Amino acid sequence: PPITAEPQPPAVTPPAETATAPPPPPPPPVAPEPDRAAVQAALASVPCSTIEATLEPGGRVRLTGTAAHEELVAEARDKVAAVADVATVDEGGLTVAAAPGCYGAVRLERAVAAAGGAASMPELGLNKPDGIYFDQDFLIIQAAMPPGLGGHLYVDVLTDAGAVYHLLPEELTPDNALPAGGRIRIGVEAAERRQGVRDWQAAPPFGPAYMVAVASERPLLPGLREVEEPAAGYVDILLKALAETPGAKAVRVQRVEFRPRP
């Protein structure tokens, strides 16, 4: 019989090798977030401002609010940027709400501190301990030179309306020379009003104001100035005098507020 070939089993094809996918990359490290308390402390050190901070992912801090001057906006940005783990600061939400009285007082305080001001400050005692004066209230100040510093005492009120009032020296109280610790009373009550004595009363425009007492071993300004003048120009003049006049100096700022009578 014819020879019949045995059927062969089908060839077995080995399975194709499956390519192994590379492992996924590790997630990027999580950047540490700034400490909220540290950011708030940095903002609290910026004077004449009301600023809020919003912490966003990636160390971004967004600032909103107001400051009295462009320089204080920059100061807020720089102080927050210096906080650990702050990556960027967005100050686009900050606006300038001009407050020339507050800003002028801060400039004077900082100038005296930078020049190594005296260890003790002048004294400013108010007849309203809370510093709040309503329309037509009489303003009385017990001012004094610092202990250990005799010379000349200058007392001004800077308002956020942009004016400065010179309480000492002025035409009716021209002598501002005092010994160390020497005291002087500025202003009188209604019953004490008389010819030749200056009285000071709260009046519009209302709002915050800043009483500034500057003590200097030597005279700072020649002669007497008008009782009222623009604050910005006067602060520049006084800063120049502080920088150019030798001798010890000290400053105190007392915030007060003038309000309409309820």
Q: Predicted regions span which residues?
A:
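Secretory-pathway glycoprotein ectodomains that are cysteine- and/or Ser/Thr/Pro-rich
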Residues: 3-262
